[in-house]
Regions:
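Membrane-interface helix-loop junctions in multi-pass transporters/channels
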Residues: 1-122
Length: 122
């Protein structure tokens, strides 16, 4: 159990650092649209779909490696709490249309790339 926590923690650190570094990219949101967060969440959803499909196809994958990748790296990398804060900010600033677009794109693209990641393995 303790070793599993170490794997999750190391993966979370790696994912969080990657997330932080991507957030430093000098890209300015167009009309306040949080494109970097959207891209990070879509990439994380794709990675989770791909890893899950690989785990299903290759049963010999190390369970601790899966904890490291799924819960740790992907959990630290994706940003649903940031997504929620940014969506609330868009709503509070009267940008309801952008908030709805951001929410729809996040959900639709997220589910789509999970399926794509799974399909690539099959």
């Amino acid at each position: 159990m303790l070793l599993n926590c170490v794997f999750v923690g190391l993966g979370g650190a790696a994912g969080s650092i990657c997330r932080y570094l991507l957030g430093l990219l000098p890209l300015k949101p167009v009309s306040g649209f949080p494109a970097i967060t959207l891209c990070i969440n879509i990439a994380g959803a794709f990675a989770l779909g791909l890893i899950g499909a690989l785990a299903g196809k290759y049963a010999k994958l190390n369970p601790q490696m899966l904890l490291f990748l799924r819960v740790g790296v992907c959990g630290g990398f994706t940003t649903s709490s940031t997504f929620s804060v940014e969506t609330a900010g868009l709503l509070q600033s009267g940008k309801t249309g952008l908030a709805m677009l951001y929410t729809a794109l996040s959900l639709l693209l997220g589910v789509t790339v999970v399926l794509l990641g799974q399909r690539l393995v099959r």
